[in-house]
Amino acid sequence: MKKLILLLILFIVSACSSTSELEQIEASSSLMPKGETYYDLIGLPAPQGSMVAAVYDFRDQTGQYKPIPSSNFSTAVPQSGTAFLAQALNDSSWFTPVEREGLQNLLTERKIVRAGLKGDAASLTQLNSAQILMEGGIVAYDTNIRTGGAGARYLGIGASSQFRVDSITVNLRAVDIRTGRLLSSVTTTKSVLSKELTAGVFKFIDAQELLESEVGYTSNEPVSLCVAQAIESAVVHMIADGIWKRAWNLADTQVGLQNEVLKKYWLEAHSVDRVQARLNQG
């Protein structure tokens, strides 16, 4: 019995120490964390020249809402796909995005500037036209594609764990402004992981004394971060696909084809033999 009581005391102390971590959480703002896809994006080989790209709308096409029992009209995925795509294009050295989502606001400001210039309106330079139009959107959000867990309880002492995996699917297309031809189209997915760990004690120490304690931990990947990573992955795959099809050129072909990031993404889309043959072609 003494060993059991000692075990319970140790369990309660560990639970209290875990709970004390909540006191260290502070509400603060910071830059969005960067994932592996971001470093792949900036690690691609240099292009022969940056292409001007326009993004009018990159929206949520799933039409899904959060599965909450109470009345709630919050969408399951963020509605900020256009902003994430523009950021990813800007972070890459391959594209120069131009503002199109807020085009009306931009035109209004230009009218104000032109009115102030009076007779010297010609000094206001014209807007840059795009070479490539980026289309697509968030095309699917699948919930509970994998679920599971494990647990055990003995004499009122036990622990359990659960996990759930959702999936976000993004489609990105590059269209030639001059001809309307589809230069590249890629579809990427990103898993959204949620997990929960719990442990508890419910045991009578003697006839009139009951010990009850529980501790738990839940972790949910931010959906907004997963959307951003799926879009970054789509941009990297699109650049790699364009190089594969020779739709756009590398600054240095010999050096660029040896880039590890480029070869990694080629191997995701093609077999080893095809990639080796493409590398031999130069």
What is the role of each PLM region?
Residues L6-L8:
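Sec-dependent N-terminal signal peptides
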Residues A121-A122, G156-S160:
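Extracellular loop and loop/strand-boundary signature of outer-membrane beta-barrel proteins
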Residues I12-A15:
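C-terminal motif of bacterial Sec signal peptides marking the signal peptidase cleavage site
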Residues G49-V52, Y56-N144, S167-S184, R274, ...:
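N-terminal segment of the mature soluble domain
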Residues S17-G49, Q162-G282:
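C-terminal/domain-edge helix-coil "capping" segments
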Residues M1-L4:
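Positively charged n-region of N-terminal signal peptides that target proteins for export
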Residues T147-A152, T198-V201:
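Outer-membrane beta-barrel translocator domains and adjoining extracellular loop/strand segments
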Residues A152-G158, E209:
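Flexible, solvent-exposed loop segments that connect beta-strands
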